[in-house]
Amino acid sequence: MALLNILQYPDERLHTVAKPVEQVDERIRKLIADMFETMYESRGIGLAATQVDVHERVVVMDLTEDRSEPRVFINPVIVEKDGETTYEEGCLSVPGIYDTVTRAERVKVEALNEKGEKFTLEADGLLAICVQHELDHLMGIVFVERLSQLKQGRIKTKLKKRQKHTI
């Protein structure tokens, strides 16, 4: 396994729409293992392949503290949404930035697992939010782009200031 580099917003590659995985093979399974290692090392709960500059429809997540429920979604599609909720989100591609995003309260998602087997998952709460957040990445959308123009401007200014201080 290897740690992967996580792209940082506003890197344009984060806006690339991911292509479907054609075949779940050893290359995809290695990508999944590397994504889990990267996500855990970065203390995240979800990671989309787009964030590591691989533009295929692969997502990993684990909402547990003890890493006991790793989930893999290959070619995920949300087939149903219901309700509305807000949640303060963060993102490994936008470190240190958190803001409230409105999303569906419940979702039903269809995907393939790491063996290439199709499954359906009905999710609510944090899992539903995480699914929607990560699937946004596959569509080239970063969570801050779900915020008002004013908030987006403030975040970009904050990130530019931070970047100047690290150079």
Curated annotation (Swiss-Prot):
Q: Which reaction does it catalyse?
A: N-terminal N-formyl-L-methionyl-[peptide] + H2O = N-terminal L-methionyl-[peptide] + formate
Q: Which cofactor does it need?
A: Fe(2+)
Organism superkingdom: Bacteria
Q: Which GO terms describe its biological process?
A: co-translational protein modification; translation
> Active-site residues?
E134
Q: How is the cofactor bound?
A: Binds 1 Fe(2+) ion.
According to its UniProt record, this protein's enzyme class is hydrolase
Q: Which InterPro entries match?
A: Peptide_deformylase, Peptide_deformylase_sf
From the UniProt record, which GO molecular function terms apply?
A: metal ion binding; peptide deformylase activity
Q: Does the keyword Protein transport apply?
A: no
Which Pfam families does this chain map to? Pep_deformylase
Q: Which UniProt keywords apply?
A: Hydrolase, Iron, Metal-binding, Protein biosynthesis
Instruction: List ligand-binding residues for Fe cation.
Output: C91, H133, H137
Stated EC number for the protein is 3.5.1.88
Q: Which family does it belong to?
A: Belongs to the polypeptide deformylase family.
**HAMAP family hit by this protein:** Pep_deformylase
Function recorded in the entry: Removes the formyl group from the N-terminal Met of newly synthesized proteins. Requires at least a dipeptide for an efficient rate of reaction. N-terminal L-methionine is a prerequisite for activity but the enzyme has broad specificity at other positions.
Name by which UniProt lists this protein: Peptide deformylase
Originating species: Neisseria meningitidis serogroup B (strain ATCC BAA-335 / MC58)
